[in-house]
């Protein structure tokens, strides 16, 4: 009897705290299950039972809308998205991304077996020289100062200072004496020049314009017979005439004189006014040619070149060039700085335009609606167990405390 009384007293004292602790500890799990279950509506005689499905499955779309509004209104505000974009688009990260893309492009070009890059480059070059440059040239050639500075610079630095070297002067003099004014050509020129009319004009002029001893010679002997005999000699005695002319050129040292004259030939020896006029004439001539025939020249030039072969050579050259590889980092850095300056000015506008395009709120709603109630329940339980375990433990402690108070009240009665 005493033992039974003691057990009853022990249960009276211990049961409320234990029961309260158990209820408090498992209340969260029970509440979560009550929120989500049943997952689907239950029907009896085609009538849906109350409280089916669970609270969250029944209002999943409205819950998704509220979650989306909360996230977009408090967490993913435009200002926060701008800050996120700034962190993501730091110069170092952007530079690394651009450098990676450039290196990837170089590798892709090297692995290109069909020469697609070369074909694209060939098309660009062909369009540039065949269409774009001729049209641009037609527009620029109308300006009065078109190529003025460039032509003047070429004239001053190249043409004005140009002089033949000793070797060049010797070769040019040899070519002139052997080809242009050879003895045979000189003989033929004499024959062509000494026509009857020219002989008569020379003879009459010599008679009229001489005086003194020369007048006596001109009027007694005259030049007609002499020039006529010279022409006859050149016609009848070709070899002898050529030999005499050659001896005359040698005796006059024409080769040496011509070489020295060519070597000393320079535009700098001309008067300043003549040089200026020559520069203007050169500029006008070049400009006139470009205006009239420049576009056609570029088009003909474009048709005469196999751009695809040239592009293949250029691409292969660039692939093997260390300059291209070494300059990738510098190029990526410059592009990153340009992008940074652009974002500093227009980041707010870009974000405001990007938010409607991204439709983040709609994505959140669609993801929540597409998630099954079972998966939502598992995710909620996982968060509670892993991140909110202290609340579960606190529920058990509070339940134990309430049960202890009940025990004290019972004992006081």
Curated annotation (Swiss-Prot):
Q: Where does this one sit in the cell?
A: Cell inner membrane
TM ranges? 3-23, 391-411
Chief place where the protein resides: membrane
Q: Name one GO cellular component term.
A: plasma membrane
Q: How does it sit in the membrane?
A: Multi-pass membrane protein
What is any Pfam family matched here?
DUF445
Tell me if Cell inner membrane is a UniProt keyword of this record: yes
**Signal sequence span per UniProt?**
none
User: InterPro entries this protein is in?
Assistant: DUF445, UCP032178
Q: Which UniProt keywords apply?
A: Cell inner membrane, Cell membrane, Membrane, Transmembrane, Transmembrane helix
Instruction: Say which domain of life the source belongs to.
Output: Bacteria
Question: Does this entry carry the keyword Membrane?
Answer: yes
**Per the similarity annotation, which family is this?**
Belongs to the UPF0754 family.
What's the protein name?
Answer: UPF0754 membrane protein PCC7424_0748
